[in-house]
Amino acid sequence: MEGNRDEAEKCVQIAREALSAGNRDKAQRFLQKAEKLYPLPAARALLEIIMKNGSTAGSSTHCRKPPGSSDQSKPSCGKDGTSGAGEGGKVYTKDQVEGVLSINKCKNYYEVLGVTKDAGDEDLKKAYRKLALKFHPDKNHAPGATDAFKKIGNAYAVLSNPEKRKQYDLTGSEEQACNHQNNGRFNFHRGCEADITPEDLFNIFFGGGFPSGSVHSFSNGRAAYSHQHQHRHSGHEREEERADGGFSVFIQLMPIIVLILVSLLSQLMVSNPPYSLYPRSGSGQTIKMQTENLGVVYYVSKDFKSEYKGTLLQKVEKSVEEDYVTNIRNNCWKERQQKTDMQYAAKVYRDEQLRRKADALSMENCKELERLTSLYKGG
């Protein structure tokens, strides 16, 4: 189950990269694959937005900088009359500053998008497309533009989801609905924890970002996701990267090589235990025995009985039982975690079949742990 989860997370990451590159079809395929492997909320949230918006994504025209222009140059789509310059000398207009202040002063998501409380999906999409392009940090360099962009993304994420919109309408304001406004991402099923970033949402609508070299990070306190736009590299830079590539790979692999060497040395220096919880023909531990106290089955070699008697045998059996109980306890925890995850996913996605599957899990290790606990109490 955990292996499937890792593969599902890889698929989600590939989907994010595809969205950044403007390839929505590829992103959709990998998100659907992730859904089949493991029910990740992030995959479901991204897929819902893609499916809901259909072919509208990417239909709007981006306001791009002309080829060869630098970050210090004024965007071709900007208004005349700048009111100042942001970091790196990036210019912004008075209208942009006023727009950012207006968005950040809004007390609820309907005000942010400029729609009424009975606005439908098309109204929300139209409002989001207009505002997202206007306040994207690659186009709008006014102070606070990044926060405004996050706010617009969260507003659409909440209001476009019927359940979250209903829940939000009960609270009445953004502050009550989400105590962490600057988290930057909104969870479609668990309050304001992150499932989809403002950049992911933007990429779904517009099929990629603006062609600049800037990086915008949106964090929710647990994990940070960065969206980096593509840089143009000269031929000389590519040659330097290739020359340094081999050495960089070696440096990255050094910790792994050291760990492998330490592990091998440890195995050579430490003698094998005189028992195994499972039959091991390679070490000759194939003779079945059972502890006197808890009745735990273990396996030893043919010379064991002659070497371990009396007190030595008692110490070995105590060690066997401790290893066995630890193993059972760990496996029981994994079983409970798996069942909890499946029950939660079934509740979130309203999947009755998944709920029945979770209820039907055998929990063999937990049953064995209960048996051992009762023996301890009985003793």
Swiss-Prot record:
Record's bilayer topology term: Single-pass membrane protein
Ranges per topology, Lumenal: 266-379
Similarity field: Belongs to the DnaJ family. DNAJB12/DNAJB14 subfamily.
Membrane side Cytoplasmic: residue ranges: 1-244
Organism field: Mus musculus
CDD domains: DnaJ (cd06257)
J domain residues: 108-172
Key words, A-Z: Chaperone, Endoplasmic reticulum, Membrane, Nucleus, Transmembrane, Transmembrane helix
The protein's name: DnaJ homolog subfamily B member 14
Subcellular location: Endoplasmic reticulum membrane; Nucleus membrane
Classification via Pfam families: DnaJ (PF00226), DUF1977 (PF09320)
Quaternary structure note: Interacts (via J domain) with HSPA8/Hsc70. Forms a multiprotein complex, at least composed of DNAJB12, DNAJB14, HSPA8/Hsc70 and SGTA; interaction with DNAJB14 and HSPA8/Hsc70 is direct.
Residue span of region Disordered: 56-90
GO CC entries: endoplasmic reticulum; endoplasmic reticulum membrane; nuclear membrane
Molecular function in Gene Ontology: Hsp70 protein binding
GO biological process: chaperone cofactor-dependent protein refolding; protein-containing complex assembly
Alphabetized SUPFAM superfamilies for the sequence: Chaperone J-domain
